[in-house]
């Protein structure tokens, strides 16, 4: 008999398009479902799948949680494709369609019967590895039973076995106490083979050194056996021989020995000695030694989260942290994803160790708070918060990815807080990555505690933030933090020109090396990647020194200094994304910059961007030192800079292009401030001129165009001017400054 299923087919998930292997009269008779062993989801045409062709469909939804795609034909028996009326003309095509619909209904009924619980070749019902549900309790001896009946029966049997185990344990405890009674002058009990005979023995060895002088009797399962009647004993070898009845498996055998003196010293020196000495805690020395050994092993191997069986990931992590702190060890994570439904709380001296790039802690869909946080860590911006009572110290995290699970949609408010929130001192982060977070990526703060172990400074290295809704990485506090390889990509996605990639402050100083911020489109955040952070590097505090870095993609400034005595050196920064902004904003005193200002982004008009802005309308800056090579941007905008001999701007200006790219200065240069800008050669020819100006009050604009011409307002230079490196070739453009063959300074008329 043909047993093939014709109208139902299942495919494994993994593809997006699937063939329809059977014919059908209407698309409404075809059902597409996602299937798992304990779940099924019927999909809707157009919104959740669509037809690629008459014989092929394409899924439009994720298949997470399912392992099969089922395509089934279910022809309606009530919705007739052809409806005959009296007096109508019968056509062969209509008859064929009607006949096919009837055949389809019959074929589907046959398949349904085969798939329900068919008989196998031997006539047995075949459940085909599926559960049989709602099964009534069995009554007759040949009836099937359900799980409740089985559990009840096993529970009764387990209770009986438990009673036997309790009695056995009581016997062993009684014998152990009797053995430990070192006050007995004569009579030391020996339990053979830990209370369980192997079975078949007619004798055994009493493992006591030296061998007992005598064994007056044995107790076998409570029945006394006397020497000379039921067995013999050799005091030289310590062997019991000639048992009248061989022992049976699990017989409980106790030998009562006789010695000339109570051997306390010998007992304490034996392998059982430590188990006979008690401690004040109620345990024995042997038990305490075992605890110490376990502590030593734990300190070497760490407390493994996966060793806590039967718990959720959150419960297992909490238990591992508590145990690690108890034995002064660390928490070891496996290379897998841990899903948490509450924050992972880190008390002082907590150490988490994962496998770099493979261990991941992810918030479940039910949790919208911080994923990992220090104990009692306050909420808020750690650039400003100072709550000493909430601090922890000595928290270490190595090689762990922390994610909130955000997909980058503005209406998904579940993931609104930080991936990582640590408020403390002496924190060490190494190889930590945070991401997919609608709030802040990593919020790190606290004040220095140099007077205690694990105090200042905190150390952050190889720390990265990706796909962040608000601020990327905040390094707060005043604990002289040391940082290395800090990377932020795609921060500030929730709102344009509001947040920062890396923020440092408010005081105490941070030492940093190899910083990198940038912004790029990503398929996971397509609705939001147009939003860009306000600042790449935001310096809100004092005495911060950053060297070696790359900054691009911010809206208002790649580097913004609002603190004091800060230095950023050996870095490269690119033009801002928004127009009329600046690459480096100096809004705090005593700032030093050394680096390269790169060409603007493709869609940023260069003539509307400054490499540097000194001061704001509300903030006057002084003691600023800038040494830079500027390419393709206006050099510096003096907005609000003052202080005698306090502003020094030196550098080279790159090749001119569109109008305004070669602008040297806009705004007002204060008296007695140094301004040195040198035009760079291009293809062996000097395009501009060396310009050294001092005391040139009221200078508003200087342009250097592609031919070396000086143009713009205030064309005549006042004050002290030195022109060097001028071309000796006679120019063709009027107004160009050059040197003739006799060394005379001339201007082409």
Curated annotation (Swiss-Prot):
Pfam families xrefs: Phage_T7_tail
InterPro entries from the UniProt entry: Pectin_lyase_fold/virulence, Phage_T7_tail_fibre-like_N
GO biological process: adhesion receptor-mediated virion attachment to host cell; symbiont entry into host cell via disruption of host cell envelope; symbiont entry into host cell via disruption of host cell glycocalyx
Keyword terms of this UniProt record: Degradation of host capsule during virus entry, Degradation of host cell envelope components during virus entry, Host-virus interaction, Viral attachment to host adhesion receptor, Viral attachment to host cell, Viral tail protein, Virion, Virus entry into host cell
Comment block on domains: The N-terminus anchors the RBP to the virion. The central part and C-terminus probably binds and degrades the host exopolysaccharides.
Subunit field text: Interacts (via N-terminus) with depolymerase 2 (via N-terminus); this interaction probably gives rise to a branched tailspike.
Function, as annotated: Functions as a receptor binding protein (RBP) and probably mediates the attachment to the host capsular exopolysaccharides. Displays a depolymerase activity that specifically degrades the K8-type polysaccharides of Klebsiella pneumoniae capsule, which allows the phage to reach the host cell membrane and bind the entry receptor.
Name this polypeptide is given: Depolymerase 1, capsule K8-specific
Source organism per UniProt: Klebsiella phage K5-4 (Bacteriophage K5-4)
């Amino acid at each position: 008999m043909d047993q093939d299923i014709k109208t139902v087919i299942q495919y494994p998930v993994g593809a997006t398009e699937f063939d329809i292997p059977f014919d059908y009269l209407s698309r409404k008779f075809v059902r597409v479902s996602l299937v798992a062993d304990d779940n099924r989801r019927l999909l809707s045409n157009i919104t959740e799948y669509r037809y690629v062709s008459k014989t092929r469909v394409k899924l439009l939804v994720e298949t997470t949680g399912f392992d099969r795609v089922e395509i089934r034909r279910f022809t309606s028996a009530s919705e007739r494709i052809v409806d005959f009326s009296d007096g109508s003309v019968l056509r062969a095509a209509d008859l064929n369609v009607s006949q096919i619909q009837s055949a389809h209904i019959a074929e589907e009924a046959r398949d349904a019967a085969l798939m329900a619980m068919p008989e196998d070749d031997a006539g047995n019902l075949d459940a085909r590895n599926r559960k049989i549900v709602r099964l009534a309790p069995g009554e007759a001896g040949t009836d099937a039973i359900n799980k409740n009946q089985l559990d009840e029966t096993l529970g009764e049997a387990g209770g009986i076995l438990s009673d036997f185990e309790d009695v056995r344990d009581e016997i062993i405890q009684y014998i152990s106490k009797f053995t430990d009674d070192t006050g007995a002058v004569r009579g030391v009990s020996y339990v053979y083979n830990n209370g369980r005979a192997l079975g078949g023995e007619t004798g055994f060895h009493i493992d006591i050194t030296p061998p007992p002088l005598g064994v007056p009797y044995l107790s076998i399962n409570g029945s006394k056996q006397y020497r000379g009647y039921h067995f013999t004993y050799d005091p030289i070898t310590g062997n019991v021989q000639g048992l009248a009845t061989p022992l049976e498996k699990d017989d409980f055998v106790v030998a009562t020995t006789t010695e000339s003196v109570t051997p306390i010293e010998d007992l304490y020196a034996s392998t059982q000695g430590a188990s006979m000495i008690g401690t004040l805690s109620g345990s024995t020395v042997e038990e305490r030694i075992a605890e110490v050994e376990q502590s030593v092993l734990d300190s070497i191997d760490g407390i493994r989260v996966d060793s806590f069986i039967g718990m959720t990931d959150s419960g297992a992590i909490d238990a591992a942290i508590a145990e690690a702190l108890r034995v002064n060890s660390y928490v070891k994570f496996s290379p897998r994803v841990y899903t948490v439904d509450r924050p992972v709380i880190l008390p002082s001296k907590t150490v988490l160790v994962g496998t770099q790039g493979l261990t991941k802690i992810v918030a479940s869909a039910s949790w919208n708070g911080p994923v990992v946080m220090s104990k009692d860590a306050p909420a808020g911006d750690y650039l400003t918060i100072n709550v000493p009572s909430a601090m922890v110290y000595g928290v270490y995290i190595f090689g762990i990815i922390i994610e909130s699970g955000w997909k980058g949609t503005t209406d998904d408010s579940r993931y609104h807080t930080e991936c990582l929130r640590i408020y403390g001192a002496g924190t060490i982060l190494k190889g930590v990555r945070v991401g997919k977070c609608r709030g802040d990526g990593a919020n790190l703060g606290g004040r220095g505690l140099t007077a205690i172990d694990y105090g200042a400074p905190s150390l952050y290295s190889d720390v990265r933030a990706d796909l962040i809704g608000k601020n990327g990485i905040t390094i707060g506090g005043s604990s002289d933090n040391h940082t290395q390889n800090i990377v932020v990509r795609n921060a500030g996605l929730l709102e344009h020109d509001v947040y920062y990639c890396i923020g440092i402050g408010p005081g105490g100083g941070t030492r940093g090396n190899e910083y990198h911020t940038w912004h790029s489109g990503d398929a996971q955040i397509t609705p939001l990647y147009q939003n860009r952070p306000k600042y790449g590097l935001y310096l809100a505090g004092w005495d911060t020194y950053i060297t070696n870095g790359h900054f691009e993609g911010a809206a208002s400034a790649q580097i913004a200094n609002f603190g004091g005595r800060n230095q950023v050196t050996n870095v490269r920064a690119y033009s801002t994304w928004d127009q009329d902004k600046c690459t480096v904003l100096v809004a705090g005193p005593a700032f030093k910059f050394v680096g390269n200002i790169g060409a603007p982004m493709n869609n940023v008009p260069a003539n509307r961007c400054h490499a540097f802005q000194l001061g704001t309308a509300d903030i006057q800056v002084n003691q600023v030192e800038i040494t830079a090579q500027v390419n393709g941007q206006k050099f510096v905008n003096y907005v609000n800079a003052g202080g005698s001999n306090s502003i020094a701007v030196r550098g080279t200006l790159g090749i001119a292009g569109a109008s305004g790219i070669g602008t040297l200065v806009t705004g007002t240069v204060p008296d007695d401030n140094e301004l040195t800008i040198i035009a760079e050669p291009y293809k062996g020819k000097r395009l501009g001129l060396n310009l050294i100006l001092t005391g040139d009050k009221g200078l508003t604009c200087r342009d250097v165009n592609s031919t070396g011409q000086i143009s713009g307002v205030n064309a005549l230079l006042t004050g002290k001017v030195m022109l060097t490196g001028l071309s000796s070739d006679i120019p063709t453009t009027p107004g160009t400054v050059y040197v003739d063959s006799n060394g005379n300074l001339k201007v082409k008329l």
